[in-house]
């Protein structure tokens, strides 16, 4: 400190001038600017500024010192650091403001705020209910940025260093995605809207209660949720037994069995129909349908094996039928997402349930679902266990209860922070030593951001969402009891996401990560990210995991920021999007089987969240080829999807691929229709199915996808 020099603060008070504060501010800006800490330069600038004022200049103000720092950084050829420093000043200035959301909210109302309106393809920003959620999100985001999240993390988010996901929900102590403990809730009862819901006495009631549970769960969190049919299968037996007991008093046992079977199958059909229609028509407090996944699994030799098989078959049959829009025209459904578990008995090698898998293959060609998970690979990666993803792709890590038993349902994800790997590479400018230095600096920042998420949840009372914390969705805590134990010791997860393995490799090596050289580097980076998560887990006891970010709008945001900062670079920033996680670039010519095999090695590292897909043409007349892909998935990759283009033009009745013109506008190739309300365009967006509404970057990515078969 300089004893003879004071500085005038923003509130007009005086404090002792401390050049170390200038030095530390410059070093922090270097971390998010050039990525390399030039300690000598930071020290020199701080000393130069101190000399200016010691030599008789008027008493410095904070603002004047900041202007001098910026000028000195430019003079010292530290342009990127100067930009980062200026960005930090802007964030700090923003944090001192109030009423900063006027423009963004008015932009929602007059439809000019396209970034927010098109951020999520499953949110229709034209609807009042959705607009209300989006407006609340803008206000919440503003408060979080100014009051809750440290300025340097907000700055890193704004600079595209990282992405603090779901910032619009950060001010509430709610979590991301989860596996609903439906077994507990249906068996032991639950409470919905302060009303006791006892264990169902029939399959139909179980299905109705399940949809009510999902709606309540979805409204109390911001991510996806998943259930397994294993938890509703016992209630199909309950219905059969009820009918059998009724009929055996009047008829022979054989006749009673036949009648009970018929009534059970009728109830099966109506129960599944209830789930489908409820989950497709419900709107949660988030302004959208619940992001729900149903896990279709059959436990061979299990007590309810037959019921599970019946439910699987009926679920797929009804999805194949589709629904109708308000005009009575046939359409597909976005939700629920179906994930079908492939095992020895249904992997199309002569198993007893191959007939269901063949039905699933047919459904793929028309409805894009189900997705496929390999029990063979899951058991290899998760100590012999199988369980569904939480929503789209997020996976839990192993955790055992006090009795040494694995527990999956009733667990959740606390939140996600994603790292922009492309910016790390662009900052390093092909200098490999610098790349690893910058990567480690930014991993430290991601860890800090994830700890902010964790700390915002600490101390939350169970009353915040009784259906989650008190009535079985996750736990059965007492009123007022803190949820803290469920945040620690790996019970729930914290996800480190990542974007742009392909572009990162191009920026550093000038080749795709599918080349031998590129693959080696990409895997090295992936393992480095995983090692970081493992280290954080060891140091904190928290459930850090590596997660392949879906990034529906994020990939466009990162690319836009980097293009402004580094310019247009071939195969890196020359498009409107970056590639999700580790995926092969959408324009790269590669065989379906080769693609799945290549990406499978990334699944084995990214165990906190992974999925792969292949793009195929209309396969309705070539089901054996679809079945071949399904069998390949079982043997080679943990989790994968088959993408077709089952679009419909409502004006002329055309079914097939709705095309994109040069202006990124959808049109019917048969009649030229361009009215979005007169067509349904269904595409796999980021694990979930979206229809008609995407941002420009994602639309361009969709348009450039090549076929893999």
Residues of each region from the PLM?
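Short, conserved micro-motifs enriched in small and acidic residues
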Residues: 16-17, 491-495
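Contiguous, well-ordered alpha-helical segments that form the cores/surfaces of helical PPI scaffolds
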Residues: 494-507, 527, 684
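Conserved catalytic cores of very large enzyme subunits
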Residues: 91-95, 101-490, 507, 511, ...
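Charged, amphipathic alpha-helical regulatory modules used
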Residues: 1-108, 703-708
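Long insertion/accessory domains within large nucleic-acid-processing enzymes
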Residues: 670-709
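Short amphipathic alpha-helical segments with coiled-coil-like heptad repeat character
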Residues: 19-23, 77-80, 302-308, 509-513, ...
